[in-house]
A protein has these predicted regions:
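Glycine-rich ThDP/TPP pyrophosphate-binding loop and its adjacent helix/strand module
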Residues: 1-172
Length: 173
């Protein structure tokens, strides 16, 4: 729509967000999409959560490189890798990258390294194929965010209230 001047009301500087898991990036369709995005300089954010796992195989078994390394082969693709378990860093990176995409009208890959805290799918129990559960728990973003809030002088009472309200909102949705 942008290239053909078919932008409608309220769509100025729109950004398309493709949220992907790391294993999906080994599929040909992702490569084709990135190739077209850089060729046409489309305003697309490829937000890749890299937990190092396919459904039941780890990254070492399924790919030669991470998406940031792979995407470097696409001339014109912006790329950034972050610790996705750090909420504040993630938020700041997203703000910066979305600003770049909106102003420069080009694609960008945000590679966020995150822990896999639960089962990958309901049919495959994590205990059956993983030996990294304790390490993954150490990278849980929620305790890190809570600690950052406390360091920013947000009281435990306030945090508990927000948690309770969020849980209630989630359960009632």
């Amino acid at each position: 729509k942008e290239i053909m001047n078919l932008i409608g009301k309220g769509e100025e500087n729109a950004v398309v967000v493709c949220s992907l898991g790391d294993a999906s990036c080994t599929e040909g369709e992702v490569s084709e999409a990135m190739q077209m995005a850089v060729l046409k300089q489309l305003p697309i954010l490829y937000f890749v959560q890299d937990n190092g796992w396919d459904i039941s195989a780890n990254a070492i078994e399924t790919r030669a490189q991470n998406i940031a390394e792979f995407a470097a082969g696409f001339k014109g693709m912006g790329i950034e890798s972050i610790d996705g378990s750090d909420f504040l860093l993630s938020y700041q990176s997203l703000q910066k990258i979305i600003h770049i995409i909106r102003t420069e009208r080009r694609p960008f890959v945000l590679h966020a390294k995150v822990p896999l805290l639960n089962h990958h799918t309901s049919g495959v129990r994590k205990e059956w194929y993983r030996d990294d559960l304790d390490k993954a728990a150490l990278d849980d973003p929620f305790p890190k965010l809570k600690e950052a809030c406390i360091l920013a002088d947000i009281s435990l009472d306030t945090l508990e209230k927000v948690e309770k309200e969020s849980r209630e909102d989630f359960l009632s949705a």
